[in-house]
A protein has these predicted regions:
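NAD(P)H dinucleotide-binding glycine-rich loop of Rossmann-like/cofactor-binding domains
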Residues: 1-65
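Residues in the short beta-alpha loop(s) of Rossmann-like NAD(P)-binding domains
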Residues: 99-103, 179, 259
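Adenosine-nucleotide cofactor-binding segment
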Residues: 64-65, 71, 82-159
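C-terminal hydrophobic helical "lid"/dimerization subdomain
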Residues: 51, 115, 132-138, 145, ...
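Hydrophobic/small residue at the entry helix of a nucleotide-binding pocket
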Residues: 39, 76-77
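Glycine-centered, small-residue-biased loops immediately flanking beta-strands
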Residues: 93, 171-172
Length: 307
């Protein structure tokens, strides 16, 4: 609801279904990222495993202290999944993140460091799978028994195929990335389904409870969604930016619908600008680790020209 609108009308269903949620976060832009975070939270919540061997009673969520593989997780949703795996209520012992573009992997490694993961009891490994012939064999070096939870972040048949092979006993594969092709399919090993209790989950967005959990995670700064806010812009540049969105690098673009401002990378403000407020904005961003922040947003709203 909202999009590029400057004002909106809530439908009666929103109120009747209890879907108007209270948000007391530090900034508007973090609130705008509740929905994408809820998709990740929902995916993690949808995972399930046996309570004990041969039990038909399931424990919902990722396997605590287990091994997780996030395949193709070098986009904004993958970044949120890394953050949530490290800082969420249930943590794995081992977290392997893959991608095929080294630049994106390097960005992930800067934002979500091995050291930060270690502080939270998680062994974090980044792997570029571009030139790896047998991905299953290579990634099992980090979890010999296989992976308890595997998340697929790209609708790629090959990735699904080796992702299925990576599952441990009672392993759960989540097909997170929605395909455009209605006939998208991949080979499935039914031997492992029968004898090793492997299973599959597909989630498409989060529900109201996932949204509530996401709000709490953002308000408490447990998950730092600012790490995926790479650009800001005003409403005057929203149309053109939307048209070329697939061609743009970076993650989420934050539109301030009452402001006039060109599409700008958060860490690329010009310190030599003639506008004093641009120079001050750069200073604020640098103080916050080159990330957009509540402080930067408040200064921007106060000083950027109105549409």
């Amino acid at each position: 609801m909202g999009g590029d609108a400057t004002t909106i009308i809530f439908s009666d269903q929103v109120m009747e279904n209890g879907s108007l949620l209270k948000y007391n976060g530090d900034s508007f832009f973090e609130g705008s990222l509740v929905e994408p975070l809820s998709c990740v939270v929902g995916a993690f919540n949808a995972q399930y495993h046996m309570k004990k061997m041969y039990s038909y009673e399931h424990v919902m969520g990722i396997k605590e202290g287990g091994a997780i593989a996030l395949l193709g997780a070098t986009g904004p949703m993958g970044f949120l999944a890394i953050d949530f795996a490290i800082h969420g209520p249930k943590k794995p012992k081992t977290l392997v993140v893959t991608g095929r573009t080294q630049k994106k992997i390097d960005m992930a490694a800067r934002l979500y460091t091995v050291e930060e993961a270690k502080k939270n009891g998680v062994k974090l490994v980044y792997v570029n799978t571009r030139d790896i012939v047998d991905v299953n064999k290579e990634l099992r070096k980090y979890s010999e028994k296989g992976f308890d939870d595997v998340f697929i972040f790209a609708p790629n048949e090959e990735m699904v195929t080796y992702g299925v092979k990576m599952l441990a006993f009672d392993g759960c594969l989540n097909f997170f990335s929605g395909p455009a092709d209605q006939e998208f399919s991949s080979r499935v090993n039914f031997y492992n389904i029968h004898y090793n209790s492997t299973h599959f989950v597909g989630t498409s967005g989060g529900n109201t409870e996932d949204m509530k959990q996401s709000i709490e995670l953002i308000e408490s700064k447990t998950v730092n969604v600012a790490k995926i806010a790479t650009h800001i812009l005003g409403l005057d540049h929203a149309v053109e930016t939307t048209k070329v969105l697939p061609e743009l690098e970076g993650s989420k673009k934050i539109v301030y619908t009452h402001k006039k401002f060109p599409l700008t990378e958060v860490d690329k403000f010009d310190e030599n600008s003639d506008d004093k407020y641009i120079r001050e904005l750069k200073s604020i961003v640098e103080r916050n680790g080159n990330l957009w922040s509540g402080e930067a947003e408040r200064y921007f709203i106060q000083n950027a020209p109105e549409i």
